[in-house]
Amino acid sequence: MNLPPNPVIARGRGRGRKPNNVEANRGFAPSLGQKSDPSHSEGNQASGGNGGGGDAQVGPSIEKSSLSAVQMHKSEGDPRGSVRGRRLITDLVYSRPPGMTSKKGVVGTHITVQANYFKVLKRPNWTIYQYRVDFTPDVEATRLRRSFLYEHKGILGGYIFDGTNMFCINQFKAVQDSPYVLELVTKSRAGENIEIKIKAVGSVQSTDAEQFQVLNLILRRAMEGLDLKLVSRYYYDPQAKINLENFRMQLWPGYQTSIRQHENDILLCSEICHKVMRTETLYNILSDAIRDSDDYQSTFKRAVMGMVILTDYNNKTYRIDDVDFQSTPLCKFKTNDGEISYVDYYKKRYNIIIRDLKQPLVMSRPTDKNIRGGNDQAIMIIPELARATGMTDAMRADFRTLRAMSEHTRLNPDRRIERLRMFNKRLKSCKQSVETLKSWNIELDSALVEIPARVLPPEKILFGNQKIFVCDARADWTNEFRTCSMFKNVHINRWYVITPSRNLRETQEFVQMCIRTASSMKMNICNPIYEEIPDDRNGTYSQAIDNAAANDPQIVMVVMRSPNEEKYSCIKKRTCVDRPVPSQVVTLKVIAPRQQKPTGLMSIATKVVIQMNAKLMGAPWQVVIPLHGLMTVGFDVCHSPKNKNKSYGAFVATMDQKESFRYFSTVNEHIKGQELSEQMSVNMACALRSYQEQHRSLPERILFFRDGVGDGQLYQVVNSEVNTLKDRLDEIYKSAGKQEGCRMTFIIVSKRINSRYFTGHRNPVPGTVVDDVITLPERYDFFLVSQAVRIGTVSPTSYNVISDNMGLNADKLQMLSYKMTHMYYNYSGTIRVPAVCHYAHKLAFLVAESINRAPSAGLQNQLYFL
């Protein structure tokens, strides 16, 4: 049986509606003396202002949402550095070493910065009780649940209700011979008696970590007074929407917020965000397919499969898994009241008239999580009621679209600070928000938090012939290649260029430019052998690669007429798996001469030469590495876009960059999207073997940077990956006669964080590190801005040291991490993360997107994936 979203039936709830304990947006009763206004609460729901569908259903899986149940999971919300969405902190993962009195460094120029945080000056001093609320017969609509419960506000007192859980300042005594503390009765509009049964779950003290769950609920209740609309997880302001009519989309500005305990104070983190809301519906996409394609069904299906859509009538999002062309809005499904057609259902429930009665239905299948929670029915959705969200690949590839969006989304620091202060002012001036915060004795500071910070000493970039460039605030040394040679060159004597015959002249001109450019950098590139192909079919490219690889070239350059994902995938599969050889793929559009910008082609040639040198184990530049015998490791994960059950974990390690420019890399496939790699210890053993073969010894120290950690996985990383890795390393080192074991530091690197900080009204310069105030007391962590941006606000990167016995202090770890952001050879400047992290990302992305299998081991010592 296939159902529409939120049908009136006990099973088959809307996708993603497995109740959880932190759905802060699900309607709140007046709290602690707040003036009651039931019409306002219901009115918001009717308008969709309180998101998540004021009609989501509740079922037997609800017990899992209690605080006591959550505590069983060692979850930290989002290990990327913030509490994402409605997930709140329960058990914390402590990474700060016992006895560590200070994790702050002292090296560098001391400055003061502002951050996008506000102090919580006052907070409640209470014990609050949590209850679970059940309705008999079951009431699916959350807005009705709120309304029915609100009728008993006199008995309940001040409370917060999210549709499932009620937080209340009153403790109700247990009823004898009953699991419930309160059993209330109310009447529906039809005159039916509705029993409301309230069961005690637990309590939260003002000193408990769970208090932040309640504080975030209260904050979201206060934000409701700002006339914001909840879409998915965050609140957005439709009144301030920005219409991009030429691109059929709107940008809704919004806020991502989180209250939690930081180093010394409880702070509210507030970040400005934007939601892309397309003005077209799935029906518009269907109409375009019918108009433009002979096989409209296949075209429409390709366009919408995997798309996330928004249904305005219940403000919920769904992922499209299939299209049922055999079903129409006239089809019927079963409810508790009997069968009903989709047309009649939407008319009766939402007063919506379906106009096209022949349109197909799109399907959203339940996830494994939904099924475990009892949501085992597919959801059927009417195309004309489903609005497309997000951006298509075509939009992302359209420079005009991106430029139009960036004018509004890439806020400079001064505009971002102004918006943050305006948000704070609205919270402190809106009557409903003020009453909500005041009733719970919560007060926010008006000023952004000020933080002590430091600017680390600038790095020295080492080139050939002992030339040195001291990196400045631009964090870019591209121009230095005009006068400097690369640190270590690999001369190219045997190489092939595969090009379509009709484009031979343009290809030869570009190759000659590369040869001249290399010569100016003291790198010798001989003339290549040209392998002309009569056409650009995949099979033709494959045959040409086979012909070239048979002659053992150092590298193969392949020219494509235009970007083509399928063709690129074919080339990379051939050169990375079937006939392993380093390859450099270029497109004619990039390498063809341009009259308008002749110097631009020289810049492209320079970048290509640098890439080719790096792929052949050369070193375009170097930084000063103070430690001998240091192996740095990067690990990242990329999910396969073609198979959601597959992901690829890439492992990249250096072989002591002070003495060697070889790398070790490998990729493992993982099933069911799991971002934890059981193969990590095996990969590490292989990397150590490669290191031993080159140096006749094991590394003195290992610095491991772990990227790709998803929500709530920090506990698993600490207790499975790190512990397994340490055990394996100790075993290897002790078997080699090193009884003290391995000295390793393991750092979680997180880019997707909401923290921002500013120097005055400007971006902080590269090397600005923050290790106080907004860091977390349970962590050994710091924030680092390593890159420079020209437009918008720079994003810091979070470093969480979860294991450390290298014997280096905070200063040295921070400076080492900063050094490693200078070593990415695909860009002559600093990047957001240590280079090995980005190398791992590039490799995982290449395999997930193009190769779909493990590359040949014959390439594992080269940066062939650049």
From Swiss-Prot:
Top-level taxon of origin: Eukaryota
SUPFAM superfamilies named in the record: PAZ domain, Ribonuclease H-like
UniProt domain PAZ: residue ranges: 281-390
Modified residues (Symmetric dimethylarginine): 11, 13, 15, 17
Compositionally biased intervals (Gly residues): 46-56
Keywords: Acetylation, Cytoplasm, Developmental protein, Differentiation, Hydrolase, Methylation, Oogenesis, RNA-binding, RNA-mediated gene silencing, Spermatogenesis, Translation regulation
Family matches, as InterPro entries: PAZ_dom (IPR003100), PAZ_dom_sf (IPR036085), Piwi (IPR003165), RNaseH-like_sf (IPR012337), RNaseH_sf (IPR036397)
Gene3D superfamilies documented for this protein: 3.40.50.2300, paz domain, Ribonuclease H-like superfamily/Ribonuclease H
UniProt key word DNA damage: no
GO biological process: defense response to Gram-negative bacterium; dorsal appendage formation; global gene silencing by mRNA cleavage; heterochromatin formation; maintenance of pole plasm mRNA location; maternal mRNA clearance; mitotic chromosome condensation; oocyte karyosome formation
GO MF term set: mRNA binding; piRNA binding; RNA endonuclease activity; RNA endonuclease activity, producing 5'-phosphomonoesters
SMART domains associated with the record: PAZ (SM00949), Piwi (SM00950)
A GO-annotated cellular component: perinuclear region of cytoplasm
Main location: cytoplasm
Quaternary assembly: Component of the ping-pong piRNA processing (4P) complex consisting of krimp, aub and AGO3. Interacts (via N-terminus when symmetrically dimethylated on arginine residues) with krimp (via tudor domain); this interaction requires methylation of at least one N-terminal arginie residue. Interacts with vas and AGO3. May form part of a piRNA processing complex consisting of tud, aub and AGO3. Interacts (when symmetrically dimethylated on arginine residues) with tud; methylation and/or interaction requires association with piRNA.
Protein name, per record: Protein aubergine
Protein's gene: aub
